[in-house]
Swiss-Prot record:
PTMs per UniProt: Predicted to be translocated into the thylakoid lumen by the Tat system.
Taxonomic lineage of the native organism: Eukaryota, Rhodophyta, Bangiophyceae, Bangiales, Bangiaceae
Transit peptide start and end: 1-35, 36-59
UniProt name for this protein: Photosystem II extrinsic protein U, chloroplastic
Described function: One of the extrinsic, lumenal subunits of photosystem II (PSII). PSII is a light-driven water plastoquinone oxidoreductase, using light energy to abstract electrons from H(2)O, generating a proton gradient subsequently used for ATP formation. The extrinsic proteins stabilize the structure of photosystem II oxygen-evolving complex (OEC), the ion environment of oxygen evolution and protect the OEC against heat-induced inactivation.
Sequence intervals crossing the membrane: none
Similarity comment text for this entry: Belongs to the PsbU family.
Compartments (UniProt record): Plastid, Chloroplast thylakoid membrane
Signal sequence range: none
Length: 152
């Protein structure tokens, strides 16, 4: 009877007859081991899955207006966090909080329609009006406008 045994790399290997099943028995402990065919099939399937899985996801990876969230001189009043206004004296925290909680705004001039603004707050808004822009509100940044979870 023809048998197949996997002993080591240098050991002679006898090929099993074609009618035999793909599971072989190890000579040492008679436990089933995976045949070469099954191992190669599994490796080919894994390689195919790796290639198929490397196709690009068609998702937006970065918000195009990230610089206006506080990383530049101009701040987006519809998406920026209140901390972004700290670079302009008089804006943080009160005026910034009013902007974050009363938006969205169509234009920067809509800021003057916020109810309850004091004369000093209006003067502060006028002072930094050229540093503000009203971009399209993005839902991903709505929760982060007041508290983005970043602390010193």
């Amino acid at each position: 009877m023809d048998s197949t045994a996997f002993v080591g790399a240098a050991a002679p290997l006898r090929v099993a007859a074609a009618a035999r099943s793909t599971i072989c028995m190890a000579a040492a402990d008679d436990k089933p081991v995976v045949s070469r065919r099954a191992a190669l099939t599994g490796a080919a399937a894994a390689a195919l899955a790796a290639v198929a899985g490397s196709l690009p996801a068609l998702a937006e990876t970065e918000y195009a207006n990230v610089p206006f969230l506080g990383g530049s001189v101009i701040i987006d009043i519809n998406n920026a966090n209140v901390r972004a206004y700290a670079k302009y004296p008089g804006m943080y925290p009160t005026v910034a909080g009013l902007i974050a909680t009363n938006g969205p705004f169509e234009t920067v001039s809509d800021l003057y329609k916020i109810p309850g603004l004091t004369d000093l707050q209006i003067a502060t808004l006028k002072k930094y009006e050229d540093k503000l822009v009203a971009l399209t509100p993005t839902p991903e940044y709505e929760l982060d406008k007041v508290n983005n979870g970043l602390y010193r």
